[in-house]
Regions:
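Divalent-metal coordination cores built from histidine and acidic residues
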Residues: 3-9, 15, 19, 23-184
Length: 184
């Protein structure tokens, strides 16, 4: 390849995406050749990955994260919705059996389930990332074995929340107004 007068840029890696078909080409045009999808509607992503693989749609390589959410009035409608620790563990097994490389635990999952869910994911060779479930702290999720806490506000909320404040709502963003007065 004669690159005289040009610039060679390696493919970029999007570390936290939620990819849809309309995003696939846009990512490539921006130089993103791999997207770490952090939770999606499983059948939609299955179709997109298949279409990219067949060359029907131009898009990046996609690394999938299995999304596990507890059922509540605030639940995300993405991934697997669970109502018990056993269902959460079954969801981990479902994702592992389909070649996902990690699971992402979300806001409404009962934080008491995290140690068992994380243990099963690690036993199966999966990483665990996620939001800090409501009514728990980043410290508790790290102690439960999280490999990664997504979004820096999820780490910092523990410094400014009062007991019982619900982070399943947009409050997880608006509570950040308290940061300027924080004295660590």
């Amino acid at each position: 390849i004669d690159g005289a007068g040009g610039t060679l840029v390696p493919g970029l890696y999007e570390m936290h995406g939620h990819l849809a078909q309309q995003d696939a080409l846009l990512n490539l045009l921006a130089g993103i050749t791999t997207v770490r999808d952090m939770g999606n509607t499983n059948p939609v992503l299955d179709v997109l990955i298949d279409r990219i693989g067949k060359g029907e749609v131009a898009g990046p390589r996609i690394v999938r994260s299995g999304f596990i959410e507890g059922k509540s009035p605030f639940s995300s409608a993405t991934g697997k919705l669970v109502e018990s620790e056993a269902e959460a563990i079954d969801a981990v097994r479902w994702y592992a059996a389909r070649g996902f490389w990690q699971v992402k635990l979300y806001n409404s999952m009962d934080p008491k389930w995290a140690p068992a869910v994380v243990a099963e994911a690690h036993r199966l060779g999966l990483r665990v990332s996620g939001h800090v479930p409501a009514f728990s702290s980043a410290d508790e999720m790290i102690a439960a074995g999280f490999d990664e806490v997504t979004h820096v506000n999820q780490l910092m909320l523990g410094w400014v929340l009062n007991p019982g404040e619900d982070t399943r709502t947009l409050f997880r963003f608006t509570a950040m107004r308290r940061f300027p007065g924080l004295d660590l």
